From Swiss-Prot:
Active site positions, chain numbering: 59, 134, 166
Protein's name in the database: Aliphatic amidase
EC number(s) stated in the UniProt entry for this protein: 3.5.1.4
Keywords annotated in UniProt: Hydrolase
Native species: Bradyrhizobium diazoefficiens (strain JCM 10833 / BCRC 13528 / IAM 13628 / NBRC 14792 / USDA 110)
């Protein structure tokens, strides 16, 4: 793991993250103009960072947040489509991989169902290698249709890459799912705003440590008339230490080199902090000392996860019993979100 240079090598993958200024757009033409701006930035960054293998832009960087529902549906993208064609040309020209946001991607039943919040991983030939749809939209505000699966793809120089989006990262389950599928780099693209800066910086570092995985965070910056975005795009080592982190500045860039050998060696030879291995080899020292299996215990000891798989509806009822039974709350009602007071009128 190297930081401070502009190079990369056969062993290291050069990764850049961008504090892209949150755009405020209203039409398809404006979206395509902004996509060309992103494409120009990709090509320009490669000149300044010749080792850059992968460039990552934040959630909402292509379309911004469409606070008007009509505009959101009208500007929703097809994948592949006009926006991805612009990005593909830039990736081919710069000979670089990219992660780009599409908010939203048209649902299969568009316009009868809400769009998806989507990321794509594109290779240096302009081909879409991974398309990820946000599993945990930021309710109650975000109205995206939820995705249902994480992916791992072979990325630049063979590094294994997973994509997640913003609020996804507040749930440890998604990080573990990606890591246990073999991800060596988890990319978290976000359009996160104040006041949650401290918490979001913290959790990405903690999840890198807990999952023995590189993390690259690209976050929006600036003010879009509604929210103020805190930036702090960062690249984090698999030991949870930050390699490079932006401040709040618009269009800030951080860059680091991620060693394939180091993470694979750590996962192979690490012992006391090899969290992936230890999770499914519980207590092997005590079992060896007891004359039992040297591989420890593999079975899941966590009742919540067992129950969730076996009985999802019953598990939801259990959670509602200790939280609430409706999506909204009476004490802070949000238009369009049912709360207990509204439910009692039916």
């Amino acid at each position: 793991m190297l930081h401070g240079d502009i190079s990369s090598s056969n062993d290291t993958v050069g990764v850049a993250v961008v504090n892209y200024k949150m755009p405020r757009l209203h039409t398809k033409a404006e979206v395509l103009d902004n996509a060309r701006k992103i494409a120009d930035m990709v090509v320009g960054m490669k000149v300044g960072l010749p080792g850059m293998d992968l460039v990552i832009f934040p959630e909402y960087s292509t379309q911004g947040i469409m606070y008007d529902s009509k505009e959101m549906y009208e500007t929703a993208s097809a994948v592949p489509g006009e926006e991805t064609a612009i990005f593909a040309e830039a990736c081919r020209k710069a000979k670089v991989w990219g992660v780009f946001s599409l908010t939203g991607e048209r649902h299969e039943e568009h316009p009868h169902k809400a769009p998806y919040n989507t990321l794509i991983l594109m290779n240096d030939k302009g081909e879409i290698v991974q398309k990820y749809r946000k599993i945990m939209p930021w309710v109650p505000i975000e109205g995206w249709y939820p995705g249902n699966c994480t992916y791992v793809s072979e990325g630049p120089k063979g590094l294994k890459v997973s994509l997640i989006i913003c609020d996804d990262g507040n749930y440890p389950e998604i990080w573990r799912d990606c890591a246990m599928k073999g991800a060596e780099l988890i990319v978290r693209c976000q359009g996160y705003m104040y006041p949650a800066k401290e918490q979001q910086v913290l959790i990405s570092k903690a999840m890198a440590w807990a999952n023995n995985v590189y993390v690259a965070v690209a976050n929006a910056a600036g003010f879009d008339g509604v929210y103020s975005y805190f930036g702090h795009s960062a690249i984090i080592g698999f030991d949870g230490r930050t390699l490079g982190e932006c401040g709040e500045e618009d269009y800030g860039i951080q860059y680091a080199q991620l060693s394939k050998h180091l993470i694979r060696d750590a996962r192979r030879n690490g012992q006391s902090q090899n969290h992936l291995y230890k999770l499914v080899h519980r207590g092997y020292t005590g079992m060896i000392n007891s004359g039992e299996s040297p591989r420890g215990v593999a079975a899941c000891p966590y009742d919540f996860y067992k129950n969730w798989i076996k009985d999802p509806e019953g598990t939801r009822d259990m959670v509602e019993a200790m939280t609430r039974s409706t999506p909204g709350t009476d004490e802070c009602p949000i238009e369009g979100i049912p709360n207990e007071a509204a439910a009692s009128n039916y």
